[in-house]
Amino acid sequence: MARFLVALLAATLVAVQAGGQLGHAAPATGEVFWRAVLPHSPLPDAVLRLLKQPAAESTSFVRDPEDRPPFDYRDYSRSSSDDEPSKSTVAASGAGGFDYDNYSGADERRGATDEYKAPSSSLAGSGAYMARGGKAETTTVFFHEEAVRVGRRLPFHFPPATPAALGFLPRQVADSVPFTTAALPGILATFGIASDSTTVPSMEATLRACESPTIAGESKFCATSLEALVERAMGVLGTRDIRPVTSTLPRAGAPLQTYTVVAVQPVEGGPVFVACHDEAYPYTVYRCHTTGPSRAYTVDMEGARGADAVTIAAVCHTDTSLWNPEHVSFKLLGTKPGGTPVCHLMPYGHIIWAKNVKRSPA
């Protein structure tokens, strides 16, 4: 079995390399699937990149912890003791040292040198910021819903995109590879990863996150192929008529600067969405969960430098009553469980799935 998997993976790597060398190669199977089941939804740039990732970009299974925002907003339930500042804690593409889609735990990193700041009156009092490593620079972590208004200003740092080394595996390959913590030794052998590699802790963390129980009222799944990602999102939302909403950000990232909101568009199809976050793994794995009662937006912003314009997808959680009272968002925003909505952006490559809303003819 192991030899069979190795052969499949080798074939996949050859295909990835060929795709990177041939500008007009045939579309990947996942791309064909997407166009068939989501004909009215163009492939987001980040997803297309995962399907046609040049081999030259895939130099390591390990993501650089320095190229991450300060928090990982995917888990509102983990205890602060679960979050370590070490380089072995490698989070998803653009995610950081905290899991902030975890609903039942405090999020404080032991030994961190980051300084947390309350909302600033100079920036309309709408966001919570943090200075990294003792530096004076600050970047938005969480923000109040009132920040999602034209004219509001927020500082953001967008790190470079760091997709999984192998991108999306073909479905038949992904389905053939075990995906459990119990099978981790065999998984490492399949990928030729040493047991003492710095990749291992992040892989194990991803597997454990996918196996962890959900809170009341939440649906969660992990998808190891593009086909599984789309089909599972359809199943959770109860319809095949769905669409993806993503942030439009530069792949190379953008330096910290103050952005001004110039346009806001609510995302229809709520109040429950499916949020998907790519996890640290040799190939692309998305961990997805229902957001609970939420409002979602696409927000157009212009940077202080003039030329830097971005569009972020943002989620505002309107019911935080089940979140841990010690969650860092409450500390930064000065609120509490069941209080005002808590908002955060979706980094590059992360996806909000929403039901398509059909309007009646006027």
UniProtKB/Swiss-Prot annotation:
GO terms for cellular component: exine; Ubisch body. The keyword Glycoprotein applies. Transmembrane segments: none annotated. Keywords: Glycoprotein, Signal. One of its GO terms (biological process) is pollen development. Residues 58-94 are annotated as: Disordered. Residues 63-86 have a biased composition (Basic and acidic residues). The keyword Cell membrane does not apply. InterPro entries: BURP (IPR044816), BURP_dom (IPR004873). Residues 1-20 form the signal peptide. Specifically expressed in anthers, in the tapetum and microspores (at protein level). Residues 142-356 form the BURP domain. PANTHER family: BURP DOMAIN PROTEIN USPL1-LIKE, BURP DOMAIN-CONTAINING PROTEIN 13. Required for pollen development. Probably synthesized in the tapetum, packaged in Ubisch bodies and transported at appropriate stages to the micropsores. This is Protein RAFTIN 1B. It comes from Triticum aestivum. The gene is RAFTIN1B.
